[in-house]
């Protein structure tokens, strides 16, 4: 117990205010980090603020590893590097480091050092309620920032309910799949059979013009014939290659059509839903909640010849006779025997695009 009149503050978190202090944040940080203390500094946040009369102030939050007993009221004094001037702060122990951190964040002109330390008082944040914490998270600019807010203001929820929080924030801050940009102009595909061109004109279009039950198409042909690049050049689409990922990060319900590329038909989940352009169906995921698929769009199935790839060979299997009868009513089957482009056309287009990107 200190004697009456003796200066003493013992705390893990210190809140310092320097009135009429014209030091830069960087200079103040350098001086604070060089102060020798028996317990390590873990986090420092500095805010430079201009009051209405134009005078600059500095607010500083310091978090120590353990409680630091300050008995020298001049210990945190700062000095000007350019003139004979000392800056003496108001020194307080910060009961809620989150409240102080939020307060000095308000003007935005801040500088941080170290890692902010979350504790029980920070979680309560003074009068901070759970609703306030989650409201601040929703208003954050990104999922990572929202997680940081919840970790700081609601650490119990962060630890006990992280899976649900993480999943929900994926939806709140959903980033639509980046639109595909074809490396070739559509005009470079100058060897496309009329059957394919006709199918595109009847089925690949936006929702307003699309048939209620569009027809899908299976295109079989050798590798390097341009099947994939042609199929992906027709408009906004979902591209599923090797396996099906219907998560929101990959699959968009606003696409005009699907492209399913190089998926063994023996293991193709939702065969009928895709080929039949079915509407409003669900896909059950192994570790998550069912995904609702809007559907109603055609699918281009791309495959090579062979028993583990060809849809025709798969449907010709005796056990799949009923499925074959259904498939022929919901899709057309086209086999291509030559590239969908002339070599010179593709090369010329590629060179032109490279030149345009370099210009």
Curated annotation (Swiss-Prot):
<feature type="active site" description="For DNA cleavage activity">
    <location>
        <position position="103"/>
    </location>
</feature>
<feature type="region of interest" description="Binding to RBR1">
    <location>
        <begin position="143"/>
        <end position="153"/>
    </location>
</feature>
<dbReference type="GO" id="GO:0016888">
    <property type="term" value="F:endodeoxyribonuclease activity, producing 5'-phosphomonoesters"/>
</dbReference>
<keyword id="KW-0378">Hydrolase</keyword>
<keyword id="KW-0548">Nucleotidyltransferase</keyword>
<protein>
    <recommendedName>
        <fullName>Replication-associated protein</fullName>
        <ecNumber>2.7.7.-</ecNumber>
        <ecNumber>3.1.21.-</ecNumber>
    </recommendedName>
</protein>
<feature type="binding site">
    <location>
        <position position="49"/>
    </location>
    <ligand>
        <name>a divalent metal cation</name>
    </ligand>
</feature>
<feature type="binding site">
    <location>
        <position position="59"/>
    </location>
    <ligand>
        <name>a divalent metal cation</name>
    </ligand>
</feature>
<keyword id="KW-0547">Nucleotide-binding</keyword>
<keyword id="KW-0190">Covalent protein-DNA linkage</keyword>
<keyword id="KW-0255">Endonuclease</keyword>
<dbReference type="Pfam" id="PF00799">
    <property type="entry name" value="Gemini_AL1"/>
</dbReference>
<feature type="region of interest" description="Oligomerization">
    <location>
        <begin position="156"/>
        <end position="176"/>
    </location>
</feature>
<dbReference type="InterPro" id="IPR049912">
    <property type="entry name" value="CRESS_DNA_REP"/>
</dbReference>
<keyword id="KW-1048">Host nucleus</keyword>
<dbReference type="GO" id="GO:0042025">
    <property type="term" value="C:host cell nucleus"/>
</dbReference>
<comment type="similarity">
    <text>Belongs to the geminiviridae Rep protein family.</text>
</comment>
<dbReference type="InterPro" id="IPR022692">
    <property type="entry name" value="Gemini_AL1_REP_central"/>
</dbReference>
<dbReference type="GO" id="GO:0006260">
    <property type="term" value="P:DNA replication"/>
</dbReference>
<dbReference type="Pfam" id="PF08283">
    <property type="entry name" value="Gemini_AL1_M"/>
</dbReference>
<keyword id="KW-0945">Host-virus interaction</keyword>
<feature type="binding site">
    <location>
        <position position="107"/>
    </location>
    <ligand>
        <name>a divalent metal cation</name>
    </ligand>
</feature>
<dbReference type="InterPro" id="IPR001191">
    <property type="entry name" value="Gemini_AL1_REP"/>
</dbReference>
<feature type="short sequence motif" description="RCR-2">
    <location>
        <begin position="57"/>
        <end position="59"/>
    </location>
</feature>
<dbReference type="GO" id="GO:0005198">
    <property type="term" value="F:structural molecule activity"/>
</dbReference>
<dbReference type="GO" id="GO:0003677">
    <property type="term" value="F:DNA binding"/>
</dbReference>
<feature type="domain" description="CRESS-DNA virus Rep endonuclease">
    <location>
        <begin position="8"/>
        <end position="116"/>
    </location>
</feature>
<keyword id="KW-0238">DNA-binding</keyword>
<dbReference type="GO" id="GO:0004386">
    <property type="term" value="F:helicase activity"/>
</dbReference>
<comment type="subunit">
    <text>Homooligomer. Interacts with the replication enhancer protein (REn). Interacts with host retinoblastoma-related protein 1 (RBR1), and may thereby induce the transcription of host replicative enzymes even if the cell is not dividing anymore. Interacts with host PCNA. Interacts with host SCE1 protein.</text>
</comment>
<keyword id="KW-0511">Multifunctional enzyme</keyword>
<keyword id="KW-0235">DNA replication</keyword>
<feature type="short sequence motif" description="RCR-3">
    <location>
        <begin position="103"/>
        <end position="106"/>
    </location>
</feature>
<feature type="short sequence motif" description="RCR-1">
    <location>
        <begin position="15"/>
        <end position="18"/>
    </location>
</feature>
<keyword id="KW-0808">Transferase</keyword>
<keyword id="KW-0347">Helicase</keyword>
<keyword id="KW-0540">Nuclease</keyword>
<feature type="binding site">
    <location>
        <begin position="221"/>
        <end position="228"/>
    </location>
    <ligand>
        <name>ATP</name>
    </ligand>
</feature>
<dbReference type="GO" id="GO:0005524">
    <property type="term" value="F:ATP binding"/>
</dbReference>
<dbReference type="GO" id="GO:0016779">
    <property type="term" value="F:nucleotidyltransferase activity"/>
</dbReference>
<dbReference type="GO" id="GO:0046872">
    <property type="term" value="F:metal ion binding"/>
</dbReference>
<keyword id="KW-0067">ATP-binding</keyword>
């Amino acid at each position: 117990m200190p004697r009456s009149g003796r200066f003493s503050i013992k705390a893990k978190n210190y809140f310092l205010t320097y009135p009429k202090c014209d030091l830069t944040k960087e200079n103040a940080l350098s001086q604070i980090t060089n102060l020798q203390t028996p317990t390590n500094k873990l986090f420092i946040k500095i805010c430079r603020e201009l009051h209405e009369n134009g005078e600059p102030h500095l607010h500083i939050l310091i978090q120590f590893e353990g409680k630091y007993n300050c008995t020298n009221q001049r210990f945190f004094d700062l000095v000007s590097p350019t003139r004979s001037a000392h800056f003496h702060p108001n020194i307080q122990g910060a009961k809620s480091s989150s409240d102080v951190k939020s307060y000095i964040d308000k003007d935005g002109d801040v500088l941080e050092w170290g890692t902010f330390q979350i504790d029980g008082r920070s979680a309560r944040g003074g009068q901070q309620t759970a609703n306030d914490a989650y409201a601040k998270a929703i208003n954050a600019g990104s999922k990572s920032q929202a997680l940081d807010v919840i970790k700081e203001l609601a650490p119990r929820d962060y630890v006990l309910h992280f899976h649900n929080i993480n999943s929900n924030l994926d939806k709140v801050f959903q980033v639509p799949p980046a639109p595909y940009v074809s490396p070739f102009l559509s005009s470079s595909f100058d060897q496309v059979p009329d059957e394919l061109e006709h199918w595109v004109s009847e089925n690949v279009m936006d929702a307003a013009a699309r048939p209620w039950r569009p027809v899908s198409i299976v295109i079989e042909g050798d590798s390097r014939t341009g099947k994939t690049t042609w199929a992906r050049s027709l408009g906004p689409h979902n591209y599923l290659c090797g396996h099906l990922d219907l998560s929101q990060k990959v699959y968009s319900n606003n696409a005009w059509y699907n492209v399913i590329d190089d998926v063994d038909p023996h293991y193709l989940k939702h065969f009928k839903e895709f080929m039949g352009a079915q509407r409003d169906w669900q896909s059950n995921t192994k570790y998550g909640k069912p995904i609702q698929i809007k559907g109603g769009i055609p699918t281009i199935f791309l495959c090579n010849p062979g028993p583990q790839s060809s849809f025709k060979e798969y449907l010709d299997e005796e056990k799949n006779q009923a499925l074959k009868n259904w498939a022929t009513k919901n899709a057309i089957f086209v086999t291509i025997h030559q590239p969908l482009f002339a070599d010179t056309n593709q090369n010329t287009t590629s060179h032109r695009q490279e030149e345009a990107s370099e210009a």
